[in-house]
Structures are given as structure tokens and as C-alpha cells.
């Protein structure tokens, strides 16, 4: 599982030029799944996201988590996080989880974030979406469950 996490002032997602979800501040997450991801992977990553200390304290050090600071989450499914561009010029997506499995895990991930007490707005799984983000910092981090659980 990969999560591209961006700290943001605001973020929104539109489908067919209509805004369907938006947040006023917090985290924008682009979320992708691979074949061996499990519900346990999802739970681990949800805890990691809400516990990361990526907001500044009074000393301007990244020392405060979203759980401590408060804020909302915009979660957007993003199968292209598992694009393989090692051969040729066209990306391959064979490392991405099949749609049905990915959707199930994506829904579970958003449920876990909600259960942790956050307002979670989402995109539409499988839809072509426009995502607008006003990045704060900018702070952008790639979380990869395979790398973090070695």
C-alpha cells in the first residue's frame, strides 16, 4: 500500500467539473494498493497517517500529528502510484491491485480513518477526477507499507 500524503490548507476533488468533496485543512491522501495488501496493511497505514508528526509546534519543529492538531482528510484512490515505468515509454499497472480488491481496501482505509475520529472526505473510486490541492509547506511524503514494515 502506498499513500502520497500532502499537508494542505485546502483540497477538493471534482468529477465532471462538479466538486464532490472538499476539506478546509489537514491532509490530502492519494492512496494506492498492490496485490499483497491486506486489511492488516490498511490498519497499519491508517494508524501511521494519523500519528505522523508533520505539523509544526511553537518552536517551528514538526512535532504535532493530525490527531493532536485536528483537521480533515481528503482521501483519493490512485492506482497509478504503482505504475512501473522501467521498460519502454508507456507505464504498466500490473503491480496495482485489481479494482474490486483495491476498492474494498480503500473503503476499509477510509473507515479506519473515520473511526480514529477524523472527518474523511473521498473521491469516487475508479472515476476520472480533478484534484485541487493548496499544499502547506509544501510537505509531501510517500508512505510505502512494504518499505516501512521491513
Curated annotation (Swiss-Prot):
The keyword Cell membrane does not apply. It comes from the Bacteria. GO terms for cellular component: cytoplasm. SUPFAM superfamilies: DTD-like. Pfam families: Tyr_Deacylase (PF02580). Signal peptide: none annotated. An aminoacyl-tRNA editing enzyme that deacylates mischarged D-aminoacyl-tRNAs. Also deacylates mischarged glycyl-tRNA(Ala), protecting cells against glycine mischarging by AlaRS. Acts via tRNA-based rather than protein-based catalysis; rejects L-amino acids rather than detecting D-amino acids in the active site. By recycling D-aminoacyl-tRNA to D-amino acids and free tRNA molecules, this enzyme counteracts the toxicity associated with the formation of D-aminoacyl-tRNA entities in vivo and helps enforce protein L-homochirality. Homodimer. HAMAP family: Deacylase_Dtd. This is D-aminoacyl-tRNA deacylase. The gene is dtd.
Amino acid at each position: 500500500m502506498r499513500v502520497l500524503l500532502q499537508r494542505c490548507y485546502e483540497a477538493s476533488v471534482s468529477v465532471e467539473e462538479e466538486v464532490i468533496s472538499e476539506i478546509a485543512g489537514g491532509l490530502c491522501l492519494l492512496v494506492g494498493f498492490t496485490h499483497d495488501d491486506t486489511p492488516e496493511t490498511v490498519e497499519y497505514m491508517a494508524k501511521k497517517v494519523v500519528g505522523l508528526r508533520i505539523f509544526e509546534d511553537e518552536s517551528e519543529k514538526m512535532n504535532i500529528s493530525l490527531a493532536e492538531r485536528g483537521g480533515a482528510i481528503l482521501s483519493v484512490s490512485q492506482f497509478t502510484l504503482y505504475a512501473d515505468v522501467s521498460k519502454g515509454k508507456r507505464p504498466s499497472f500490473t503491480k496495482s491491485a485489481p479494482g474490486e480488491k483495491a476498492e474494498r481496501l480503500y473503503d476499509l482505509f477510509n473507515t479506519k480513518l473515520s473511526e480514529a475520529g477524523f472527518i474523511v472526505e473521498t473521491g469516487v473510486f475508479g472515476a476520472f477526477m480533478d484534484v485541487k490541492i493548496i499544499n502547506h509547506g509544501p510537505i509531501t511524503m510517500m508512505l510505502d507499507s512494504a518499505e516501512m514494515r521491513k
